[in-house]
């Protein structure tokens, strides 16, 4: 709670700052997708047979922009106390929004890295118009960590009801149980248990560490996206 600060109000401002950092990193993550999808849509405009896929991706871009605008317009309240109950209410509210976004993102990632990839090969016979394997790996790794962070930010504060579950984590646990996987020895990030924090000071410290990790993952993903754009551009220029 307030043991790391003599003034409770200062502690509350710090909590608000932490929430703003989390909000910013999610916004950056969403913006990265909007940017690369717009680039990819521009490339697909040159391929008449990919009209349906292009239209679907445009719909996803609109959804992503909606999520981002909603997030950016949201103002975190200035907490009047560092009471854990008050913080839980705030975390549950923003966590629920993140879960809604991530469930859609899961479908988008599948569509982008599986369905569209197959259609590109089938309709153009040009594999260089696809996302490179390195970019797909970054997409998956970044998504997995954003999912795990969202689970952590809620469950570390003992927010763990039926409406706060994330499908990909629940499915991973179900499969692990059926396969008799030792959950204490697994390297699967979705199967790793979330330990509750002992104080809000610890929660804030770990949140900042998480934000740093997520920022690094976004930077790595954006680097692969830039390389993908170069590949697509070169592939389409050769056809002129």
Curated annotation (Swiss-Prot):
<dbReference type="GO" id="GO:0003723">
    <property type="term" value="F:RNA binding"/>
</dbReference>
<keyword id="KW-0963">Cytoplasm</keyword>
<comment type="function">
    <text>RNA-binding protein that binds specific mRNAs including the ASH1 mRNA, coding for a repressor of the HO endonuclease. Part of the mRNA localization machinery that restricts accumulation of certain proteins to the bud and in the daughter cell.</text>
</comment>
<dbReference type="Pfam" id="PF11435">
    <property type="entry name" value="She2p"/>
</dbReference>
<keyword id="KW-0694">RNA-binding</keyword>
<keyword id="KW-0813">Transport</keyword>
<dbReference type="InterPro" id="IPR024261">
    <property type="entry name" value="RNA-bd_She2"/>
</dbReference>
<protein>
    <recommendedName>
        <fullName>SWI5-dependent HO expression protein 2</fullName>
    </recommendedName>
</protein>
<dbReference type="GO" id="GO:0051028">
    <property type="term" value="P:mRNA transport"/>
</dbReference>
<dbReference type="GO" id="GO:0005634">
    <property type="term" value="C:nucleus"/>
</dbReference>
<comment type="similarity">
    <text>Belongs to the SHE2 family.</text>
</comment>
<keyword id="KW-0509">mRNA transport</keyword>
<dbReference type="GO" id="GO:0005737">
    <property type="term" value="C:cytoplasm"/>
</dbReference>
<keyword id="KW-0539">Nucleus</keyword>
<dbReference type="InterPro" id="IPR036827">
    <property type="entry name" value="She2_dom_sf"/>
</dbReference>
<comment type="subunit">
    <text>Homodimer and homotetramer.</text>
</comment>
